[in-house]
């Protein structure tokens, strides 16, 4: 049909989009002639058939091609992997990144020139290669092009010239095809004239001509399909232009950032130079020379920047002139081709008029040709209907083209606005350049003043040398400066400590705080193993069996508290960690140590304690309530408390209503959003510190406690207090979740020292086993092993999110200073030292955005639309079967006219459904693009990651669809494919914007139950959901 489509040497290939008005489009000569002949439809000013003057067409074409050439360097970069893969050749092996620029290697360029990679590459990629070479030459300061790059550029230009010549040959072949078609039409006219004789042989020839007309009808239908494909390609070009505009905006932003960075660097350099001048007054003459040299360097940099600006302007003007010359040549060729097509159209019109006159003469023939005459009239009516349909299709296509041209005008205005902005930026930077010059002049004046000041200082030094007493005063001043420096040393040391803590937080290390328990009244302080407690987290322990330096052992932690430290001092250091829970972080604080080392005192405080003796649990919740009240104008918080214990490897609920019979709880294999993986544990909402005290008292009363030889009230279980926080931003509607786990571990003990038997012995065995499992987990994390044994005990399963997740974790190491507990103290300190080296990774917050829900609703509506279109396709696919059955029955009778009427109704009905589907798909895609532009700007600030499991709905096409014609099947499925593209784009956008959908249910969806309480507060409270 069209030799351009099947031509293997076509420079554009099969994948490049072509305009239906391009001389290289897949439309035939008749199609272009018919489009040109239809003068009733409005033309766009950017069309080659526009009634504008020649100069205006030249200007418009030059502007459009210049914009496409500028955008091609950003859109289809020859160095990007996408364009290389499109051309089928590995151009990215030739260009390599080197310090932000493309380094062209001589060996690879020579290989590419010898091979046939340039012959098979698309023309657009060759133009982008040429633009990339020119851009790289502009970025260089000298503006020269290397020899190997010049050879490659010459090769690319020769390849483009060769392709232009091949395109001219294709035009000649099309002319030959048009001449052959004219000969065919002439032969048909001769056949119609021969029909006047009325012989039977001539009648058969006429029927053969009618068959040929039917084949041409099918060819027209195929040409319609090609036109629709061209429209789809034009839509893709529209999307590509949008991407090009966004790329230009990004480039402008990068240039702004570069200029601001240069400005900040110059300011920092000037500040450092000032400080050097003030400190080095004695060597002022040498420093003056250095400053003069730096001043010369600044002048050189300014001159270099001016040269670069001039080179860029010259290159820009050269490109403009080249593009204008190319567009002039192309427009002259198109105008000549248009004139030829108009002349050929006139010839065809004259032939058509002669044909119509001949048909009128045939109507006057005898009865023998009457049947053939009626058949010809019916075929002529069908052809007229086809012409009307093609005209309507052309009008719709031209309307769409006009819309696209309006979009191009809008984009051109946007580009002009961007150019104006760039000019304003250039003016602003020129003003900054003037300010820099004034600053340099001020510096030079300051240098002159410093010279005069240095001379005066020299005179003063001569006077000081003469006076002996003044020298002692100078020595005194120096001693004062040394004392000030010694005082500043402590401030610098505290700043370094703060920076180290921030570094540890970024790494995600487990912070370790060591607290030394004071001696009891009955014990003597002389037998202590603690030799020294430093302010920088240093702890020195001495071995009582090895006195002297050999028995000393030093440990380093984040913080070490002496026996005199109060509960308020301890909580002041962990307050920032606790407050981060309200920002959506998970925090875990647990106390570790041997029996009787003060773990419960640190976490809870003494029994019946006042507010001054409160432990970490009460103080943390009290601080959370205060902050939540201060933020209630912006964020509404809900706080819930959960308290469980692990007793003999069983998880029990400490806030359960039935105290006599505790219920054993299960642990889920996957952690929920509410922190602990124990959904059956009771959870109570709290609004004040008094509610927390009541619940804590209930939990402590239910906790397993026993007496041993080492401690009268020893904890025989691990208790975990979990505080769940849910916050909702009143302005944006975003939801955040935070969890605070406060763990009081049971103490490790030696059975021979604790003197336990029976149940207490079994309890001690379970406690030591769980603590040893915790040590195995810590050792695996410290060594970064691939397998971490979390399932070895219930304790490690519950602490899995804190030890292996993205949580902020802190461990209190409780130390018994008694000399009799030296071995237990050493094992505790070694364990803590190993824990401090574990890196968990940076903690991350959990937030849920409002835009995620909107996207999911929009995705559901698109799926419903696709389902409706699937049902409509199935309905349309059933109609051809019924038509075929009716045709088979009517053929036996001979009613062919009814069949034609039925097929006409079916084609019109399917055409109406297709147009409805196309309008629905286009409106859905436009709505999606508007929504996507609003959401992507908000999603960039959220910084969340994740994935959404969206199952694509497969198209439901039955096997009976094979009976449908090619026209109906492709035209019906086209709007459905468009809708599916919109749905898939929405799915990918949701997956990039958020990672919180799987965990967005929050505390509201957790299975939290309440069966009653033993206290008045627990009875009146409801379940927190």
Swiss-Prot record:
Alphabetical UniProt keywords: ATP-binding, Coiled coil, Microtubule, Motor protein, Nucleotide-binding
Signal sequence bounds: none
Amino acid composition bias (Polar residues), ranges on this chain: 65-75, 901-913, 939-948
Residue ranges of domain Kinesin motor in the record: 509-838
SUPFAM superfamilies: P-loop containing nucleoside triphosphate hydrolases (SSF52540)
InterPro entries: Kinesin-like_fam, Kinesin_motor_dom, Kinesin_motor_dom_sf, P-loop_NTPase
Region: Disordered, residue numbers: 1-87, 263-286, 881-926, 939-977, 994-1025
GO biological process per UniProt: microtubule-based movement
Coiled coil: 203-425, 847-879
Residues reported to bind ATP: 593-600
GO MF term list: ATP binding; microtubule binding; microtubule motor activity
Comp. bias intervals (Basic and acidic residues): 29-41, 270-286, 950-962
Similarity comment text for this entry: Belongs to the TRAFAC class myosin-kinesin ATPase superfamily. Kinesin family. KIN-14 subfamily.
Name of the molecule in the record: Kinesin-like protein KIN-14P
Originating organism: Arabidopsis thaliana
Protein's gene: KIN14P
């Amino acid at each position: 049909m069209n030799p351009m489509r099947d031509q293997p040497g076509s420079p554009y290939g099969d994948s490049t989009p072509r305009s239906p008005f391009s001389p290289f489009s897949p439309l035939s000569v008749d199609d272009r002639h018919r489009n040109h002949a239809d003068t009733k439809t409005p033309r766009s000013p950017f069309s080659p058939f526009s009634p504008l003057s020649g100069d205006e067409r030249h200007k418009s074409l030059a502007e459009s091609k210049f914009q496409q050439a500028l955008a091609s360097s950003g859109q289809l970069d020859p160095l990007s992997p996408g364009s290389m893969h499109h051309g089928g050749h590995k151009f990215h092996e030739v260009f390599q990144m080197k310090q932000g620029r493309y380094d062209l290697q001589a060996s690879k360029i020579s290989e590419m020139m010898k091979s046939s990679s340039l012959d098979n590459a698309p023309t657009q990629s060759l133009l982008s290669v040429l633009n990339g070479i020119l851009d790289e030459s502009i970025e260089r300061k000298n503006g020269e092009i290397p020899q190997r790059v010049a050879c490659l550029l010459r090769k690319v230009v020769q390849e483009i010239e060769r392709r232009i010549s091949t395109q001219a040959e294709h035009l000649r072949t099309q002319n030959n095809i048009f001449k052959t078609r004219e000969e065919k039409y002439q032969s048909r006219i001769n056949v119609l004239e021969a029909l006047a004789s009325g012989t039977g042989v001539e009648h058969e020839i006429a029927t053969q001509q009618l068959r040929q007309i039917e084949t041409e009808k099918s060819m027209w239908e195929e040409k319609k399909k090609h036109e629709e494909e061209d429209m789809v390609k034009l839509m893709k070009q529209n999307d590509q232009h949008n991407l090009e505009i966004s790329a230009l905006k990004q480039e402008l932003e990068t240039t702004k950032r570069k200029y601001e960075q240069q400005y900040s660097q110059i300011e920092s350099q000037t500040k450092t130079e000032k400080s050097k001048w003030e400190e080095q007054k004695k060597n002022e003459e040498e420093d003056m020379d250095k400053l003069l040299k730096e001043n010369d360097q600044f002048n050189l940099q300014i001159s270099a920047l001016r040269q670069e600006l001039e080179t860029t302007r010259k290159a820009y003007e050269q490109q403009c002139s080249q593009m204008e010359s190319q567009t002039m040549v192309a427009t002259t060729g198109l105008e000549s081709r248009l004139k030829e097509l108009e002349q050929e159209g006139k010839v065809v019109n004259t032939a058509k008029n002669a044909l119509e006159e001949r048909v009128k003469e045939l109507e006057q023939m005898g009865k023998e040709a009457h049947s053939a005459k009626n058949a010809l009239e019916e075929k002529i009516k069908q052809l007229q209907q086809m012409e009307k349909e093609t005209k309507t299709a052309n009008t719709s296509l031209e309307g769409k083209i006009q819309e696209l041209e309006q979009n191009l005008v809008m984009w051109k205005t946007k580009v002009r606005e961007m150019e104006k902005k760039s000019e304003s930026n250039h003016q602003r930077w020129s003003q900054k350049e003037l300010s820099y010059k004034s600053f340099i002049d001020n510096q030079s004046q300051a240098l002159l003043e410093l010279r005069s000041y240095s001379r005066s200082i020299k005179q003063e030094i001569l006077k000081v040398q003469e006076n002996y007493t003044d020298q002692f005063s100078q020595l005194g001043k120096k001693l004062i400066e040394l004392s000030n420096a010694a005082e500043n040393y402590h401030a610098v040391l505290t700043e370094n400590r703060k920076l180290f803590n921030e570094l540890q937080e970024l790494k995600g290390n487990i912070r370790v705080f060591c607290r030394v328990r004071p001696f009891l009244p009955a014990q003597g302080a002389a037998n202590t193993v603690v030799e020294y407690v430093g302010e920088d987290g240093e702890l020195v322990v001495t071995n009582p069996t090895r006195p002297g330096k050999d028995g000393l052992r030093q440990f380093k932690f984040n913080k070490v508290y002496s026996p005199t430290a109060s509960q308020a001092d301890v909580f002041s250091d962990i307050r920032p960690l606790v407050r981060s829970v309200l920002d959506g972080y998970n925090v875990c604080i647990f106390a570790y140590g041997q029996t009787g080392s003060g773990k419960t005192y640190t976490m809870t405080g003494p029994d019946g304690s006042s507010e001054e003796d409160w432990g970490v649990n009460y103080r943390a919740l009290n601080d959370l309530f205060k902050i939540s009240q201060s933020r209630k104008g912006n964020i509404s918080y809900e706080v819930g408390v959960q308290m469980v214990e692990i007793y003999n490897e069983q998880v029990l609920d400490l806030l359960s209503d039935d105290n006599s019979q505790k219920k054993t709880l299960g642990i889920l294999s996957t952690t929920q959003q509410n922190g602990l993986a124990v959904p059956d544990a009771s959870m109570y909402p709290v609004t004040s510190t008094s509610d927390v005290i009541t619940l804590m008292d209930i939990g402590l009363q239910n906790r397993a406690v026993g007496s041993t030889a080492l401690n009268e009230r020893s904890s025989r279980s691990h208790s975990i207090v979990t505080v769940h926080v849910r916050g909702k931003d009143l302005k944006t509607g975003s939801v955040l979740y935070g969890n605070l786990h406060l763990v009081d571990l049971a103490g490790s003990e030696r059975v021979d020292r604790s003197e336990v038997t029976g149940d207490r012995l079994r309890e001690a065995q379970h406690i030591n086993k769980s603590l040893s499992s915790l040590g195995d987990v810590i050792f695996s994390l410290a060594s970064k092993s691939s397998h971490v044994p979390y399932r070895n005990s219930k304790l490690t399963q519950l602490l899995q999110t804190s030890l292996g997740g993205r949580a902020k974790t802190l461990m209190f190491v409780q130390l018994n200073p008694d000399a009799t507990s030296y071995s237990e103290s050493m094992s505790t300190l070694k364990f803590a030292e190993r824990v401090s080296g574990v890196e968990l990774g940076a903690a991350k917050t959990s937030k849920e955005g409002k835009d995620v829900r909107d996207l999911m609703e929009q995705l559901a509506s698109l799926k419903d639309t696709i389902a409706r279109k699937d049902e409509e396709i199935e309905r349309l696919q059933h109609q051809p079967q019924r038509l075929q059955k009716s045709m088979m029955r009517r053929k036996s009778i001979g009613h062919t006219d009814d069949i034609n009427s039925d097929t006409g109704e079916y084609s019109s009905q399917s055409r109406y459904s297709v147009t409805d589907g196309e309008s629905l798909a286009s409106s859905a895609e436009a709505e999606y693009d508007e929504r996507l532009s609003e959401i992507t700007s908000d999603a960039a600030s959220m910084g969340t990651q994740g994935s959404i499991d969206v199952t694509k709905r497969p198209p439901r096409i039955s096997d009976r669809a094979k009976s449908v014609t090619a026209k109906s099947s492709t035209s019906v499925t086209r709007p459905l494919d468009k809708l599916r593209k919109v749905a898939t784009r929405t799915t990918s956008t949701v997956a990039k914007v958020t990672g919180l959908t799987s965990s967005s249910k929050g505390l509201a969806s957790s299975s939290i139950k309440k069966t009653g309480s033993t206290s008045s507060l627990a009875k009146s409270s409801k379940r927190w959901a």
